[in-house]
């Protein structure tokens, strides 16, 4: 059987009723999206001759792996696709330049301490090298961005993030800060060197990667949000260019221009990295995306 089966009157009538298109109640946009989504799933079932057991196996996988959706989204490339799609829309609108955006990941925590420049991020003992990172935040014409707040977070040397550490050993907001920048747009911080991590062994993401013949590893990296009045909010991260997984990030977070190589000297490592923001055309562009994030009082 071919996918023309999905276009038969009986199936098309079913889709109309599923999406509520026969009713003038509800949200027309949601109806259209749901209809296309369900129809696409039907096409997949017919195209690949997916049987009943496989369908319910997929449902069980999603139910049991719901706690790892934040890892599955980047793992199957959807979070990176959103970045590429937004880049394409920017190009279509004539917007260009600025530090590349890349995936946020699932491990941001709201409410990190707000500190002044030259901040220490690490509260807990960690037997590893010290990272020093500094640079400038500028606008599209090279002007220093004033009143900016740089959010920064990363893992510890074991690859664990505070608030998500399965060992429970990290104090709240370890390796997490919001840094208020001065009028010169300069930032600086130091912390203990992060390490990369892998998805939880035996979890939904790990099982899917094994079925696909892929690994679930991320290189060592540091996450950033940057917000400032009059500029587009930036979500990005740097992957350490000398990490063996920098060119093969399971989450597809590696992007050209975001791969600095730390200058390692004894027990310290230094990264100089400048960020460039785009101007906002409206206040909505200054705001964060509306995804759910962990908030800690």
Feature-to-residue mapping (PLM):
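Beta-strand-dominated extracellular/periplasmic modules and repeats
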Residues: 2-297
């Amino acid at each position: 059987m071919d996918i023309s089966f999905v276009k038969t009157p009986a199936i098309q009538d079913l889709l109309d009723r599923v999406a509520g298109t026969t009713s003038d109640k509800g949200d027309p946009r949601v109806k259209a999206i749901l209809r296309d989504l369900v129809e696409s799933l039907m096409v997949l079932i017919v195209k690949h001759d997916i049987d009943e057991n496989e369908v319910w196996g997929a449902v069980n996988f999603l139910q049991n792996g719901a706690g790892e959706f934040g890892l599955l989204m980047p793992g199957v490339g959807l979070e990176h696709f959103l970045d590429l799609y937004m880049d394409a829309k920017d190009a279509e609108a004539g917007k260009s330049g600025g530090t590349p955006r890349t995936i946020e990941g699932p491990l941001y925590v709201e409410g990190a301490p707000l500190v002044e420049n030259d901040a220490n991020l690490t509260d807990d003992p960690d037997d590893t090298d010290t990272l020093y990172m500094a640079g400038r935040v500028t606008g599209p014409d090279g002007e220093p961005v004033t009143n900016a707040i740089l959010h920064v977070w990363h893992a510890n040397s074991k690859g664990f993030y505070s608030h998500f550490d399965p060992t429970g050993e990290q104090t709240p907001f370890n390796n997490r800060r919001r840094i208020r920048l001065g009028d010169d747009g300069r930032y600086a911080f130091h912390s203990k060197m992060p390490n990369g991590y892998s998805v939880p062994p035996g979890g939904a993401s790990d099982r899917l990667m094994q079925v696909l013949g892929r690994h679930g590893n991320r290189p060592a990296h540091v996450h950033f949000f940057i917000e400032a009045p009059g500029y587009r909010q930036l979500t990005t991260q740097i992957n350490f260019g000398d990490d063996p997984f920098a060119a093969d990030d399971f989450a597809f977070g590696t992007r050209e221009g975001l791969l600095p190589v730390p200058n390692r000297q004894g027990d310290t490592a230094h990264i100089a990295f400048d960020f460039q923001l785009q101007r906002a055309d409206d206040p909505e562009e200054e705001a964060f995306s509306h995804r759910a994030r962990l908030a800690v009082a």
